[in-house]
Amino acid sequence: MALLQISEPGLSAAPHQRRLAAGIDLGTTNSLVATVRSGQAETLPDHEGRHLLPSVVHYQQQGHTVGYAARDNAAQDTANTISSVKRMMGRSLADIQARYPHLPYRFKASVNGLPMIDTAAGLLNPVRVSADILKALAARASESLSGELDGVVITVPAYFDDAQRQGTKDAARLAGLHVLRLLNEPTAAAIAYGLDSGKEGVIAVYDLGGGTFDISILRLSRGVFEVLATGGDSALGGDDFDHLLADYIREQAGIADRSDNRVQRELLDAAIAAKIALSDADTVRVNVAGWQGEITREQFNDLISALVKRTLLACRRALKDAGVDPQDVLEVVMVGGSTRVPLVRERVGEFFGRTPLTAIDPDKVVAIGAAIQADILVGNKPDSEMLLLDVIPLSLGLETMGGLVEKVIPRNTTIPVARAQDFTTFKDGQTAMSIHVMQGERELVQDCRSLARFALRGIPPLPAGGAHIRVTFQVDADGLLSVTAMEKSTGVEASIQVKPSYGLTDSEIASMIKDSMSFAEQDVKARMLAEQKVEAARVLESLTGALTADAALLSAAERQCIDDAAAHLSAVAQGDDVDAIEQAIKNVDKQTQEFAARRMDQSVRRALKGHSVDEV
C-alpha cells in the first residue's frame, strides 16, 4: 500500500505499452542520463562509449558545442566556455561574484540583478546554459531509445532553494522536456541502493559532487524511503579541491599573474589531472606553464583536509537532527565523483565506523535512481510499492502581532505537505492583512529569515476578531512553497509562490538551528513578553472603542478608576516586566467588569425594544 502516490494526467500507460522516461543527473562538473531497460536502470553512453557528459558549453557566433568538445576549447577560449553553471543557478550576480571570484567570465547584471554571461553568442543566463546541457542529454536519450522522451526526472542538490529549483525547471522547459519531478540527489541515490541491495535500517548518503555537498540520513524499511534529516553545503565540492590545488601549483611554479585566463585554465586542468591521478598514485608529476614538479598525495591531503572536515561537521549536525548516533548507521552510501578521493573515503569511514559503500559507480548512482523514479512516474510501474518521503530543512511560518513567528510547518516535516491555520483581525473595521512568510527556528521575526510578503485585501469591516482568515502553506514534491490566505465568509483570497533571489548556505542553516537551541530559554521569555504586550494593546484598543461608544454609562468616579487602570497598563506595557503587564491587564479587567455588564444589558434592551415577549 503506497503512502505517497504520484501520477501525471494523461501519462497512464496502456497495457504492454511502455513510455520512454529518463533520469537526468544535472551535475556541476559532469551530467548523465539514464533509463530503465529490461527492468534494469542504466546510464546511456555517447557514440564513443562515454557515459559522463562534461557540464560545459562553448559558445560561438554561429552555434555552440556541449561536453567534451566544449571542454577542449576551455584553455583557448575561456570567456566563451561556460562550466560549473549549476553554481550560478538562482543566484544574484553580486552573490556569484562574492562566492566565486575566480570565475573567468564577463558578467553583466540584468534589470533584476540576475547574472548574464557575455559570450560570442550574446548575453546568456544560467538557465539558457543549463538548457543547452539538458538538450544534449535528451538528444542522447532519444537516439538511444529510438523515440522522444515522455518525461524526465531531474536531480538537484537537497539544499537548492526555490529559485534554484525553479531555474532548473525553466531550463528543462526551454530544452523541450516534460519534468515529471525534481528529485533530491541523495534521495535518488537511496532509491538506487534501496532497490539493488535491499538494505533496511538507517543509511547515510554522503554526496560530494563537483560543486555541492549533501548529507542525508534516511531510514529504509520495506520499500519506504524516509529522509530523517538533511544537511550540506550548496557551495562546496570537488571544484574547491581543484582550486586549492591549482593555487598550490601556482605558488610552487611562482606564477604571480592572475589576470591571464589561459594560464588560469591550464593551472586548473593540471590540478584536476593531478587530483585524479593521486586517487591511485602516491606521487604525480605536473607540467604547467613551463614549470615541472611533483605533487604528493600527502600534500594534496593537507590542502583539502579542512574542507573534508567541514563535510563531517555537516554529517554530525544531520545525525543530531535525525536523533541517530553514528554507530546506528548501517551503511554509508558514497555519491559523487569526489568521493573517489582516498582521504574522503578514509575520513568518512572513520567518522561512521564502517567502510563506505561504493558498489554502484558514485558518478552514476544518482542518475540511476532518477531513472528508476522516472520509470514509475511515467506509468511503467503502476503497482510499485516504493514510497518516497523528503523533508524540509527549516520551519516555515508567519509573522503575527508583536513581531512573533507562528510556525505552520515544522522543520523535518515530510513533503509534499499542506498545513492550514486560522488567523483573525486585530482592529475594528480592519479590511486588509499583511502576510509575512518566515523561515527559521527562532521565536521572533528579527531572528528568522524573511521569504516573502503579500497582502490580503477585501476583508469585511468587522469588529476586531470578527473576520477569520485561513492561511494555507503547501510545499510540493519539489520543495517549492506556495502560501494562500482566504477570508472565510467572502472567499476573497491572495497567494504567493516563494522564489528567493538566492539561497541559504549550509553554514547559515546550521547557524539558525544552533541559535534556536542556544537561545531557547531567552526566546521563550521574549515570546511571553511580546504576547503580553500584544494582549495589552488589544485590551487598550477594545477599551478605547467601548469608552467612545458608551462612556455615558459610567459615573465620573468609575471613569477615573478605569482611566487610571488603563494608564497604568499603557505605562507598564512599555517595559519588560511580564508579570507586571499581566497584573495590569487583570486590573483593567477587574475595573471594567461592571462597565461590561452595563453595556451588555444596554445591548439586550436595544435588541428587545419594540418586540413583545411572545416574539422573543
From Swiss-Prot:
SUPFAM superfamilies in alphabetical order: Actin-like ATPase domain, Heat shock protein 70kD (HSP70), C-terminal subdomain, Heat shock protein 70kD (HSP70), peptide-binding domain
BP GO annotations: iron-sulfur cluster assembly
InterPro entries for this protein: ATPase_NBD, Heat_shock_70_CS, HscA_NBD, HSP70_C_sf, HSP70_peptide-bd_sf, Hsp_70_fam, ISC_FeS_clus_asmbl_HscA
Keywords: ATP-binding, Chaperone, Nucleotide-binding
GO molecular function, one term: unfolded protein binding
Source taxon at top rank: Bacteria
Functional summary from the UniProt entry: Chaperone involved in the maturation of iron-sulfur cluster-containing proteins. Has a low intrinsic ATPase activity which is markedly stimulated by HscB. Involved in the maturation of IscU.
HAMAP family: HscA
PANTHER family: HEAT SHOCK PROTEIN 70KDA
Protein name listed in UniProt: Chaperone protein HscA
Organism: Salmonella heidelberg (strain SL476)
Underlying gene: hscA
